[in-house]
Regions:
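Structured surface interface patches that mediate subunit assembly and partner/cofactor docking
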Residues: 2-6, 10-13, 20-33, 50-196
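Extended, alpha-helix-rich binding/interface surfaces that flank or overlap catalytic cores
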Residues: 40
Length: 196
């Protein structure tokens, strides 16, 4: 199967956001309940490698669920590591064979083409999470928004345990990114509370 989309725009956006995170922002809250910027960056370190392995199929039969809670350590080289892993993930999904058959990530087996969309969703939505938590604005390619809207349009309003919270109602005429965020259980108006 030929690649259905390219990860470069989403990867480039996430790298720019990660590059702009400052050390004093690591303890800031994020839209992910109970997760700080540090926690979310540690999650991104893990997911970028997991989805690269899903593309190469090296994870098949040996992937495991991500650690529960927010106990994953953040490596000292998180900034350069995330950038490097996003580059290799992008390259891995450019290989036509990556899109064939089934694959695994995080202990979940899916058709490879569906796994690619899950990876795109994770990269795109967590880029927004990190951006809004650190006072930035993410850039999302219109083509990526269209892919993710189609993927998520049948989301259960009650959410998907372990993945998405209950859908947040967003006006039909809201920007496409806001409508996508609502489907993932996020409030597009979320902002960190002002320091006391």
């Amino acid at each position: 199967m030929e690649p259905q989309f390219d990860f470069e725009p989403a990867a480039r956006s996430l790298v720019a956001i990660v590059d702009a995170v400052t050390e004093d922002q690591l303890t800031h809250p994020t839209p992910c309940a109970g997760s700080t910027v540090r926690d979310l960056l540690a999650h991104v370190v893990g997911l970028t490698e997991a989805f690269r392995q899903a593309a190469t199929k090296e994870s098949v039969g040996r992937s495991t669920p991500p650690p529960a809670g927010n106990d994953s350590p953040l490596p000292d080289d998180w900034r350069t590591r995330i950038a490097a892993q996003l580059e290799t993930l992008t390259s891995a999904w450019r290989v036509p064979e990556a899109w064939d058959g089934d694959t695994e990530a995080g202990g979940v087996e899916l058709p490879a083409a569906v796994m690619a969309i899950v990876a795109l969703d994770e990269i795109t939505v967590h880029a927004w999470d990190l951006a809004v938590a650190t006072g930035q604005r993410p850039t999302v390619a219109p083509a990526d928004l269209a892919i993710l809207h189609e993927f998520l349009c049948e989301t259960d309003p009650a959410g998907t345990p372990g993945l998405f919270g209950p859908i947040v109602e967003v006006p039909a005429d809201a920007p496409a990114l806001d409508r996508l965020l609502g489907l993932t259980g996020r409030d597009p108006a979320w902002r960190p509370a002002a320091p006391a």
